[in-house]
A protein has these predicted regions:
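A conserved beta-strand/loop element that lines the FAD pocket in flavoprotein oxidoreductases
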Residues: 1-9
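Hydrophobic/aromatic beta-strand patches that form the interior of the parallel beta-sheet core
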Residues: 2, 44, 183-185
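Flavin-dependent oxidoreductases
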Residues: 10-15, 26-111, 115-126, 135, ...
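C-terminal catalytic lobe of FAD-dependent flavoproteins
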Residues: 91, 95-97, 104-105, 116-250, ...
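Iron-sulfur (Fe-S) cluster-binding segments and ferredoxin-like electron-carrier domains
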Residues: 121, 258-269, 292-310
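Short Fe-S-cluster ligation motifs
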Residues: 279-295, 312-338
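Short flanking/linker segments adjacent to small metal-binding domains or redox-active Cys/His motifs
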Residues: 294-302, 330-352
Length: 352
């Protein structure tokens, strides 16, 4: 797994025309990504809002994806029982509209908006968008209280745009014409999350038809979840602590997440390397205080276990570093050591 490697070019390497399948005729794709070069007979383009850029590197027939931003409010768990099922509104050409839904962990989720924007990295929330979420959500559940919002966020849906009305407008899942082994999984809008397992199986069948392979006899078809102290019985908690005392060290008080759970999240295959990675695997930081209490401890554990300087630990990848240095050391852009400001005296002290 090569994380944080931006693909900059894809070149198809193929010999003179042949009736043989790609793996026998030597057809390969050369993928350049942040100084690394990868060769593969099959490329699966599942790049979300960037899927058009990947597709257009190799295909003559171009596609265009417009990022469609959706803003959400996540409400406190004391609102989780306001509804017991998802409440939908009248759908429109932009989507299913503002919904109100209980989450599996007991919160209440309200949203999303739908707004086409030009920037594929713009996941900022807006005052107007969040007000719209609350106002329209209140049409379904009049007891919604904006003061119970514990966090808000925005995501981007990959809206596939075609000039010709007859062209497919979403769920482009197919082998690209004229480019065997290059598979698009693009324009996945609602219900993309629900469809994800079926999409995976469908793409696997496409791959099997292109590149026949034997099924593994020792394939592990299930994954043991990370133990949850919040959901465990008293007996299960005691057993976990006896096996590993780290399960007795509570890191996130809001969601009752322990050091033992965070260690499992870090050291599993394709383990967590960021604060958000830990959060998504364990819920550490997803509670009412939104990591105000646990983030320093989680950062410390990540740095220790990954053998990195704490300043290298990020929230969600490159560019989201949390620390800039240690107190009382040279500050960025300054020539001398940090000095404590002098306390004001005289009239200045009165104004303070």
């Amino acid at each position: 797994f090569y994380r944080n490697h931006k693909v900059t070019s894809i070149v198809e390497q193929r010999p003179v025309w042949s009736e043989n399948p790609p793996e026998k005729e030597g057809r390969m794709y050369q993928v350049q990504a942040d100084g690394e070069m990868f060769l593969a007979p099959i490329v699966i383009n599942a790049a979300g809002v960037y899927a058009d850029e990947i597709h257009n590197m190799i295909c003559e027939e171009k596609i265009r994806i417009v990022p469609r931003r959706g803003e959400y409010r996540l409400m406190d768990k004391n609102c989780g029982d306001l509804v017991n099922s998802t409440i939908f509104q009248q759908p429109s050409k932009m989507g299913k509209g503002i919904l109100v839904t209980p989450t599996v962990h007991g919160n209440l989720l309200v949203g999303p908006t739908a707004e086409d924007i030009p920037d594929k990295q713009d996941v900022d929330t807006t005052a107007e968008g969040l007000a719209k979420v609350l106002n329209l959500g209140s049409n379904s559940v009049d007891a919604l209280d904006g003061r119970q919002t514990i966090t808000s966020f925005a995501g981007l849906r990959a809206h596939l745009v075609h000039e010709a009305p007859a062209e497919k407008s979403d769920f482009l899942i197919e082998e690209a014409a004229g480019h065997p082994g290059f598979i698009d999984v693009a324009g996945i809008e609602s219900p993309g999350l629900t469809s994800a397992p079926a999409i995976g199986e469908y793409v696997a069948r496409i791959v099997e038809n292109i590149y026949p392979a034997e099924r593994k006899t020792d394939f592990i078809d299930s994954r043991k979840g990370i133990p949850s102290m919040a959901l465990a019985t008293e007996e299960e908690r005691e057993a976990l602590i006896r096996e590993n005392p780290a399960f007795a060290n509570v890191i996130c008080r809001c969601e009752l997440v322990t050091e033992g759970e965070i260690l499992e999240a870090i050291h599993r295959p394709v383990g967590a390397t960021t604060l958000d990675g830990v959060k998504r695997r364990t819920r550490a930081g997803m509670g009412r205080c939104q990591a105000g209490f646990c983030s320093p401890k989680t950062l410390e554990i990540l740095a220790r276990e990954l053998q990195l300087d704490p300043a290298q630990i990020t929230k969600e990848g490159i560019g989201s570093e949390i620390l800039v240095g240690k107190n009382k050391e040279t500050a960025p852009g300054e020539g001398g050591a940090w000095k404590k400001p002098q306390a004001p005296v005289g009239k200045e002290a009165l104004h303070e």
